[in-house]
Amino acid sequence: MKIIIYIFFFYSIYPLAFAGKYDCIIATKKYELIYNLPKNLLISVSLVESGKKIKDGDFISWPWTINMGGKGKFFDNKEKALEYTNNFIFKGKKNIDIGCMQINYMY
């Protein structure tokens, strides 16, 4: 299970600048297959943790989601999410949930 957490943490800081509409869904489906997890388990978790209604009306999980102290924020791209997150990390804050699956930075 730890490997799944690490995989999703690294996916949360995925090197693309802009998130694609289905990036989180693609990643969750991939790792459900690799680890023989129940179908749609990770997709369900990601929708609950980082779900966002987008312009075309779809409800998707969003990779550039940051949550601190129960206040979730959705960013347009990686750079904005990292800038926001790094400001708090430099101040010593570590209890920050990041990305599709909202993996906690502290752990």
Predicted features and spans:
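Catalytic glycan-binding domains that act on GlcNAc-containing polysaccharides
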Residues: F18-Y107
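Sec-dependent N-terminal signal peptides
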Residues: I3-L16
